[in-house]
Amino acid sequence: MKNGKKAVPLSQKSSKTTPNVMNLYRSTTSLYALLLILLCAFCGLSTQAQSQPSLFLQPSPKHEVRAVWLTTIGGIDWPHSYSNGSATSIERQQRELTTILDQLKAAGTNVVLLQTRVRATTIYPSAMEPWDGCLSGNPGKSPGYDALQFAIDECHKRGMQLHAWVVTIPVGKWTSAGCMQLRKRYPKLIKKIGPDGYMDPENMQTGSYLADICEEIVRNYDVDGIHLDYIRYPETWKIKVSRTQGRRNITAIASAISRRVKSVKPWVMMSCSPIGKSDDLRRYSSRGWNARTVVCQDAQEWLRTGVMDALFPMMYFRDNHFYPFAVDWQEQSYGKIVAPGLGTYMLNRHEGNWPLNVVTQEMYVLRSLGLGHTHFRSKFLTDNTKGIYTFARRFNQTPAVVPPMTWLSSTLPDAPTHFQQHKHASGEVTLAWQSADAAHLLYNIYASRTWPVDIDDARNIIATRHTSQQITLAPKGNFFYAVTAVDRYGNESKPLQSVEGAGARTGARELIATDGLLKCDGYKLTLPEKPSTLDANVVCIETMQGKLMTSLPYRGKYADVSKVPEGFYQLRSINKRGITHRLGFFMVKRR
């Protein structure tokens, strides 16, 4: 649960069929192999096996949002100690953050959503609201340094974006520092529900005030995004207006903030974290908890109209309460960024005690859909809860860059010029270049033993969002290098290629998977082409929980799935030795 957000993990039964595997091997397969196949198919893979990246899945994409919510309220993610303003306490608190950021960077994270406005309180010196107590231990008291500026600098050093996470409607306990100062200044703006205070979503001044807060952040800090949280009606609010009017009220607040932010820095990414199910789907109910109808969050419409550049839906669900709704977010993304929030905290035995493969399979599917992913929250990831951090490091073996916001600007910056390369006696290599518009550009650096360096291959990325026009690299042998300029919208120039380097050209890997879901029209599934290195003769269709639905010969271009119930499935190959490989994911959907 994030900031009082209600997550409703539910289970769903799936249909059961009994496939006739014997017919597939009636003359060529031994009983021993059959037993192995049946054991693998019906029992499923072990958690360890399911958490392993398959050799037959696509390589890590170059463009992908890999985000994490870093929570400051109560210091539950950070900080773990208080700063009284002394050099020692400041350094200790800052070291805690840099340790977390180092861990996140090593796991492939490229976007940090840092809780900046907590409960009408902030982690920076604001002219409008008091300091939050998470830093000093006392609300209203400075920790002796600007925590937001420090976090921005440290994220940017590591090539990561920092988005200021702004909690909008909730303002804390009725007697808390943030709520009390707002009540005194704007008595008609704050409503009490139980022991808590909330900004009135039906008061036009709410949007104006929150726009002022976000403008203060954007004007004073080099944030890469403004991330709105709880931009909705509270679930405990008795909505007396029509749902249509309720959606207009919330949209007016979101629009006011977005317009203000873009008027100051149009490249700052606007995003929010809607409820994980946009609305009821044709075949899948939201079970009474969705964004659009229940709390008047018209998030998909915000993407369409440009109010938002990105969505981070809180999809803290599993099974059929996750997969169909993930597809819905993808289908209604309008070419914008969607990076669903994962219930990583549910791996904890005191939360949902989910097995690891629930989250890892969701990550595989999101990547197949071309979506990003966001861990809720940082501590559960970096604590390696049930091995999720170990998995994330394998899953994100290569760096990724955030997709460009081409709907805002699609003009490519000019490529860097005057490439210089110097190899030191230590083996280190210093690269330098020039750029005409250096004050407004960042740089990506690539290396490969093949010339020209392929900048579309994520395996060649060695640094992203580099801020200077020079970099020194550790000795790793002889390579060719390339440098690109990147503007604040994420548009990347053509590469400036080095002319020095050595090494043999490497061949491409033989892969099966596509860049998205396997094609399926609800009746016919397109099988991926079988490479020469794969000796499998059978494919199995399984639920995401590993339950076997049917087995089919691995031959031809198509498989008949007309008798498979609608739902989300994985396709696996099985060879005569009972060894399985995941080939991809697909959805059976009939209209």
PLM features: residue spans?
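Catalytic domains of carbohydrate-active enzymes, especially glycoside hydrolases
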Residues: 95-121
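Active-site-adjacent "subsite" loops/lids of carbohydrate-active enzymes
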Residues: 63, 71-92, 164-216
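Aromatic-lined carbohydrate-recognition surfaces of secreted/lumenal glycan-active proteins
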Residues: 161-173, 227, 248-291, 338-341, ...
